Amino acid sequence: MGYDDVITHLGEFGPYQKRIYYLLCLPAIVCAFHKLAGVFLLAKPDFRCALPYENGSIYELSPHLWNLSYPENERCSYYDVDYTEEYLNGSIPRSSNETKTCSSYVYDRSKYLNSAVTEWNLVCSRSLLSATSDSLFMLGVLLGSLIFGQMSDKLGRKPTFFASLVLQLIFGVLAAVAPEYFSYTISRMIVGATTSGVFLVAYVIALEMVGSSYRLFAGVAMQMFFSVGFMLTAGFAYFIHDWRWLQIAITLPGLLFLCYYWIIPESARWLLMKGRKDEAFVIIEKAAKENKVEVPNEIYEQLVDEVAEKKKQDEMAASQPAATVFDLLRYPNLRRKTLLIFFDWFVNSGVYYGLSWNTNNLGGNQLVNFMISGAVEIPGYTLLLFTLNRWGRRSILCGTMMVAGISLLATIFVPSDMNWLIVACAMIGKLAITSSYGTIYIFSAEQFPTVVRNVGLGASSMVARVGGILAPYLKLLGEIWRPLPLIICGALSLTAGLLSLLLPETLNKPMPETIEDGENFGKKPAPQETAEEGGTQELSGMLNGKSG
């Protein structure tokens, strides 16, 4: 008897669960605002050096004046000459080819009235600061997953959700009024941390209250709400051209979720784990009433017994050495699978965010590119609902990553004047990597043994965040050669897809429970039976020696 059996009596996805679930999906939209708005907050418009004779700030110059003032393909310096009227009229030749570094800039404000880049001149020698700001935001996401993950397990899902939501509101506004780059970046980093508290905790509450047969749908559908937020971010940027007002606009919708304090319950599953059975039973009874079902009294009695038994098991487990990531790296087959999974997580996160933040470098309408990049995620996630339990996890993971790699690498051969085809290849890659990213969550959970599953998933998530932290620097490479970010993402995706063929399929296979199960899972049989038996006995001896 377990809590999943209680959900079976309540209805795996009854009216009560649906109401709470869809309310919990809405914060994913706001978290998408914060994660992706950096594309517009730190938008880099066309720019040039302000020339010594200029008093205005009009970006456009005639081709004649441009050739007289700037070296070819150079935006961060200008010719160090005497800009007299005769020189500008072309009456006298240029006296020197020496250049001078810019001290101020003129920006093309036809698309962006004001961004953090234009306000603090984050171009040329300071362009690295723009990518660093996004990178530190993703570092905040990593730290938030560690901090708020621990908080939600110890203090509860609901308090953690609202603590992170309040912090998100406060530091979202502080980022908008930041007087300089440093305070803006720190505020945004804290906002990044809170997205883990808001989104991931809501995700956990939602999945903990639905039945097992609906969890794939529930997990994928919540990701689709994130994709909706992705697209809506472009809508905000279309109407709001000043970065400070844009930051406020994406923050204020979070105020609506404060009313959830009186609507969203604590996770009954978590309450039972903590021995707070009376509070859990109140929530179960409320759900039963709304679902118009009755939960038999013996169910509650069995739950009480289970809670007592679980407490004993936890006390026994606490006396044993805690599982660590080194347990996954100790044995050859398990180590090989773990490193492959880590690489898949790194690539999926890096490529996903690399493509999401690179839409401004694709050419064409930047807002349209960004919106399409969010829209293609919907079919990417929908694909999983119809294929993941039919075709297998490995087939989907490898197939989607290879499709992403091939489509992105194909941009090498696309002529520069066929911009629509470059965008199309990039969006096919984005759709495919979205499907891959959704698959790796399930696939890796089924690869790790039960005794170290949480450790393995936590380590995988951290490796993924490293990919996200590095992703903002990819778009800087587009200044060297525009297709370069797509080529790097494509090469990584194709490599990871091919290497994933070395992982065993997990569909309809029992998940490994012990370290020994994990080591043997997917291992090729030895050529001789005696060799196989000897290897198994040796491994068992190693494991028994470790546990002793």
UniProtKB/Swiss-Prot annotation:
InterPro entries, per database record: MFS_dom (IPR020846), MFS_sugar_transport-like (IPR005828), MFS_trans_sf (IPR036259)
Membrane-topology annotation of the record: Multi-pass membrane protein
Q: Which GO terms describe its molecular function?
A: transmembrane transporter activity
- Stretches the record annotates as Disordered: 512-548
Q: Where in the cell is it found?
A: Membrane
Query: What are the annotated GO cellular component locations?
Result: membrane
- Cite the ranges annotated as topological domain Extracellular: 44-127, 180-189, 241-244, 359-366, 417-419, 475-482
Q: Which cysteines are joined by disulfide bonds?
A: none
Q: Which residues lie on this side of the membrane: Cytoplasmic?
A: 1-22, 149-158, 211-219, 266-337, 388-395, 441-453, 504-548
Q: Which domain of life is it from?
A: Eukaryota
Where do the record's glycosylation annotations fall on this chain? N55, N67, N89, N97
One of this protein's GO BP terms?
apoptotic process
**Pfam families per UniProt:** Sugar_tr
Where, by tissue, is this protein expressed?
Expressed in embryos and adults at low level. Expressed at higher level in third instar larvae.
**Which keywords does UniProt give here?**
Glycoprotein, Ion transport, Membrane, Transmembrane, Transmembrane helix, Transport
The regions listed as transmembrane in this protein's record are 23-43, 128-148, 159-179, 190-210, 220-240, 245-265, 338-358, 367-387, 396-416, 420-440, 454-474, 483-503
Protein task: Probably transports organic cations.
The record's family statement is: Belongs to the major facilitator (TC 2.A.1) superfamily. Organic cation transporter (TC 2.A.1.19) family.
Against PANTHER family, the record matches this protein to: SOLUTE CARRIER FAMILY 22 MEMBER
State the protein's name. Answer: Organic cation transporter protein
Organism expressing this protein natively: Drosophila melanogaster (Fruit fly)
* Gene name as annotated: Orct
